[in-house]
C-alpha cells in the first residue's frame, strides 16, 4: 500500500473526475468460481495512519500575492461586494447546482456569496504558473485538526489583470473528499468473511512514517508504534490474521527496528516499500543498506514482502539487481514480490527479468514467490493482460498467490478484488483455482 505526497489532492482529483467521467462496474465472477484460501497482501489503517492520510500537504510554491487573494476570498465569503473585485472581468464559474457556466465577475461574486452558509478556508494543494497566469488545485475546508472537514474540492485558473491577481475560472465540486476512517482487525475479518477467505497477511504501514513523502515528528517512534499496533490488532484473531512489520530499509535506524520486530515474536515477516522510501538500487549506498536489511531478515527468519518499484524508471536493470544482488542475501526465507512485478504501473520489462530468471532456474529464486494484488487493474489493456498471463505462466502458477491490498483509499475489498482478477486476466478456471488454493510457505511453517 503506497501513500504518496498529496493523498487528498489525488482524492480531490478523483472526485472531480467522477463528475465528468464514468466509473466502470466490475462484473461478478461466476458463482462456481473458487474462493482464495488466503489474502497474502492486506493492510489495516490505524488512527495515526488515518490522520496521516487525512492531513493535506499544502503547496509551498504559491506566490504570496495569490495567497493574499485566497485569504481575501475567504474574508468576503458572504459579501458579493467584497468578492466582485477579486474576479477577472470575463470570469467563468461552474454552477454545480445547474450545472451551468456563470459568466462575468458580478455573476461569479453573487454565486459564491450565496454558496457557503459558514466561513471556509481554501487549502492550496498544487500550484503551477508564471507571472501572468496559473492553475490551482485546492480544498474548501472548515475546522482544525480532528475537527477539520473538507466541504469541497476546487480547480481554479488565475490571471493578472490591471496589475493584480484575479480569479478567471472556478470549477468547484461538492462534497469534498471523504476522510479515511481507521480499519481495524474486526473490520478486516468481516471483509474476509464476506469474501469467504479464511486468512490474511497483514502488512504494517509503519514505513509511511519514515517516508520522505510525509513530514512527521519522531518518525522512528511513530514507525515503532505502528508496528506494535498492527501486531496487537492481529493478535486478536490469531487463527485468521498474520502480521508483518515494516520499516524504511535505507534509514539509519532500519536494522535496529528490524531487530525489535524479530524479538517481538508477533511478526512472521517484514514489508519493504521501495517507492515510499524513494529507493534506487542503482545507487550504491541504497543497495548496500537494502542488502543489509535482507541479510538481517534472513538471519532472523523473517519472510520478506517487497514493493520493488522505487521510481517511475523502474524496469529491467532494477529487477536484475534484485535477483542478482538482493535475493542471494536472503536465501533461507521466502521473498514475496508485491503486485506481481513490484507495484504501480505495469512494468513488463521487470516482470520479464523475474520470469526468465525463474525459468532459467537462477539459484537465488528458489524461495521467490509473487502476490498478484492489483495485477488486473494495473495491467490496463487486454493486450497487457495477455502479456501478463504469459509471464505468469513462465513464472509458474504454483508461485502465484492471491492478494488484494488495502480495503481503503479507493481500493476494492477482498471479494471485489478477486472478482476483478477473474474478469481481467485471461487465465483458465484451473489456473484460478490453483492460485486460490496456494498458501505461502511462511504460513505453512
Predicted regions and their residues:
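Short beta-strand edge/turn micro-motifs at domain boundaries
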Residues: 151-174
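Catalytic pocket-lining loop regions of alpha/beta-barrel enzymes
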Residues: 268-269, 282-401
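Mid-to-C-terminal alpha-helical segments outside catalytic/metal-binding sites
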Residues: 36, 52-54, 81-85, 164, ...
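Short, low-complexity N-terminal intrinsically disordered segments enriched in polar/charged residues
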Residues: 29-36, 54-76, 81-85, 168
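Short, well-ordered alpha-helical segments enriched in acidic and aromatic residues
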Residues: 69, 79-96, 435-438
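Active-site gating/metal-coordination segments in enzymes
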Residues: 198-199, 207-312, 317, 374
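Surface-exposed, charged secondary-structure patches
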Residues: 92-93, 106-151
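A short gly/proline-enriched turn/hairpin at secondary-structure junctions
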Residues: 48, 92-102, 115
Amino acid at each position: 500500500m503506497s501513500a504518496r505526497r498529496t493523498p487528498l489532492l489525488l482524492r480531490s482529483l478523483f472526485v472531480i473526475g467522477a463528475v465528468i467521467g464514468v466509473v466502470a462496474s466490475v462484473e461478478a465472477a461466476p458463482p462456481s468460481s473458487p474462493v482464495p484460501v488466503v489474502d497474502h497482501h492486506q493492510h489495516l489503517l490505524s488512527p495515526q495512519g488515518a490522520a496521516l492520510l487525512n492531513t493535506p500537504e499544502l503547496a509551498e510554491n504559491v506566490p504570496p500575492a495569490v495567497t493574499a487573494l485566497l485569504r481575501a476570498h475567504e474574508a468576503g465569503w458572504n459579501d458579493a461586494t467584497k468578492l466582485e473585485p477579486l474576479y477577472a472581468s470575463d470570469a467563468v464559474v461552474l454552477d454545480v447546482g445547474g450545472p451551468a457556466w456563470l459568466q462575468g465577475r458580478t455573476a461569479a461574486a453573487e454565486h459564491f456569496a450565496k454558496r457557503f452558509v459558514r466561513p471556509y478556508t481554501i487549502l492550496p494543494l498544487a500550484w503551477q504558473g508564471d507571472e501572468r497566469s496559473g492553475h490551482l488545485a485546492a480544498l474548501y475546508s472548515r475546522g482544525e485538526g480532528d475537527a477539520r472537514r473538507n466541504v469541497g474540492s476546487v480547480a481554479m485558473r488565475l490571471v493578472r489583470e490591471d496589475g493584480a491577481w484575479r480569479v478567471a475560472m472556478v470549477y468547484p465540486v461538492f462534497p469534498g473528499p471523504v476522510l479515511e476512517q481507521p480499519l481495524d482487525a474486526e473490520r478486516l475479518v468481516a471483509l474476509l468473511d464476506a469474501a469467504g477467505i479464511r486468512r490474511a497477511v497483514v502488512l504494517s504501514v509503519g514505513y509511511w512514517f519514515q517516508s520522505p513523502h510525509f513530514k512527521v515528528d519522531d518518525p522512528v517512534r511513530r514507525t515503532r508504534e505502528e508496528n506494535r499496533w498492527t501486531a496487537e490488532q492481529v493478535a486478536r484473531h490469531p487463527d485468521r490474521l498474520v502480521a508483518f512489520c515494516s520499516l524504511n530499509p535505507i534509514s539509519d535506524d532500519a536494522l535496529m527496528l528490524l531487530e525489535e520486530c524479530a524479538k517481538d515474536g508477533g511478526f512472521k515477516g517484514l514489508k519493504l516499500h521501495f517507492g515510499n522510501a524513494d529507493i534506487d538500487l542503482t545507487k550504491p549506498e541504497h543497495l548496500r543498506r537494502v542488502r543489509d536489511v535482507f541479510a538481517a531478515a534472513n538471519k532472523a527468519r523473517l519472510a520478506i514482502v517487497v514493493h520493488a518499484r522505487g521510481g517511475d524508471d523502474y524496469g529491467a536493470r532494477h529487477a536484475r539487481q534484485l535477483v542478482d544482488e538482493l535475493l542471494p542475501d536472503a536465501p533461507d526465507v521466502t521473498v514475496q514480490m508485491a503486485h506481481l512485478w513490484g507495484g504501480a504501473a505495469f512494468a513488463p520489462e521487470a516482470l520479464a527479468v523475474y520470469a526468465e530468471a525463474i525459468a532459467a532456474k537462477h539459484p537465488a529464486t528458489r524461495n521467490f514467490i509473487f502476490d498478484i494484488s492489483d495485477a488486473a487493474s494495473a495491467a490496463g489493456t487486454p493486450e497487457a493482460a495477455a502479456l501478463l498471463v504469459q509471464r505468469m505462466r513462465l513464472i509458474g502458477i504454483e508461485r502465484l498467490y492471491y492478494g488484494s491490498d488495502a480495503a481503503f483509499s479507493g481500493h476494492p475489498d477482498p471479494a471485489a478484488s478477486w472478482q476483478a482478477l477473474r474478469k481481467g486476466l485471461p487465465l483458465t478456471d484451473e489456473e484460478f483455482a490453483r492460485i486460490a488454493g496456494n498458501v505461502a510457505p511462511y504460513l505453512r511453517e
